[in-house]
Regions:
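ATP-binding/phosphotransfer module of carbohydrate and carboxylate kinases, centering on a glycine-rich
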Residues: 11-18, 61-200
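Phosphate-binding/catalytic loop of phosphoryl-transfer enzymes
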Residues: 1-75
Length: 200
């Protein structure tokens, strides 16, 4: 985890800022320009990981079984995944890497299939609410914990951040936070860092 955090920081910035990872799991750290300072200790996928793939996968499953998902979306979700309760419980409680299994459902948010346009408003509203709740939760727990949060840019790493950029902007405004860079793949930023700071 420490190596991932350091890589994320150097992929995003060389200046002071807060760097957030939204991947299978989630994390954040404050970089003062020299040293990386982690946020709260992570207690893992079952207790934390706000706005991660694991978090959104769990939310989708809960909404499906609690009938909180729009009907047309629920039908497509059931078509795409094996939602047999015993299969889900086996993968979550008996198999290795349950966090990755849960995160695999999150791709549905950004690729819900060929759904009819007449359902677009309901579907987009559902996904907007789902994502914004996760992002707000992350901001409150993993960004505002740093006293520097309103003084430095907030950078994001990961596919979830990449596909949710507009929602992240909306969520940051009430907290008077400044959005920095959003990088889908950390390796892209690391290559740029290497070119600009190592090769020169």
């Amino acid at each position: 985890v420490q190596e991932d955090t350091i890589a994320a920081v150097y992929a995003a910035t060389t200046l002071p800022g807060i760097v957030c990872i939204l991947g299978t799991g989630s994390n954040s750290s404050y970089f003062d320009g020299t040293t990386v300072h982690p946020s709260a200790v992570s207690l893992g996928y079952s207790l934390m990981d706000e706005a991660s793939g694991n978090y959104f996968g769990k939310r989708l499953l809960r909404d499906y079984f609690y009938n909180k998902m729009p009907a047309v979306l629920k039908a497509e979700f059931a078509r795409r995944f094996d939602l047999t309760p015993d299969v889900i419980k086996y993968n979550v409680y008996k198999q290795e890497n349950p966090n990755m299994y849960l995160a695999s459902f999150a791709e549905f948010i950004f690729n819900p299939g060929a759904l009819r346009p007449k359902n677009a408003i309901e579907i987009n509203g559902y996904f907007y609410k789902l994502i914004s709740e996760g992002i707000n939760n992350f901001i409150e727990c993993r960004v505002l914990c740093f006293k520097e949060a309103q003084q430095v840019p907030i950078h994001f790493i990961g596919s979830i951040a990449h596909f949710s950029e507009d929602i992240i902007r909306d969520c940051m405004q009430p907290y008077h936070l400044t959005l920095g860079t959003i990088i889908r793949r950390p390796i892209d930023g690391l290559i740029e860092y290497y070119r600009n700071h190592i090769l020169k």
